[in-house]
Amino acid sequence: MQPIIRYFSFDDVTASQGWDLLSWCRSHGADDFSLTALVSPVESGRMKAFFARLDVYSKSNAVRHQLAAAPGEAAQRDTRLWRLTEQTEAILRESWGVGFVSNEYDVDLWLEDLAVYRAGDLMMGVVSHENGGVLRLTELELSELRHSSFPDRDSIPWIGF
């Protein structure tokens, strides 16, 4: 069965709703994640500490769908992954102060473009600089999310799947 594709805008979602969405994805089978870290001009102590905490949960790189790609770069590409667990979710919450549904950045710990996978397939992902994300769900899951008042849209400019 083909998943239903829905979108969400950071304008409609609070940081708390974003974290609730991550927990919801984990409770519905999401098992790993990727993210992008920007380092300028050198890696900060906070960045090193963040990745040191995640290292315990790292998985082998695998080909995964990425929503953000440079011109000429494939959407399906080798991706650094971590297991999505209660512990890694807590690390993300503690470290990513503004949350992942924000286009605000912390220069010392500049994280963006969280992507969450279920059995290797993208379930939820954001493109931070485009102010939104995508969901790939079953009809029942979409109904459940809507019942929880999570705001979804038909489309978001510059984000597609």
Question: Where are the regions a protein language model picked out?
Answer:
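Structured alpha/beta or helical-core interaction and ligand-binding surfaces enriched in interleaved
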Residues: 1-161
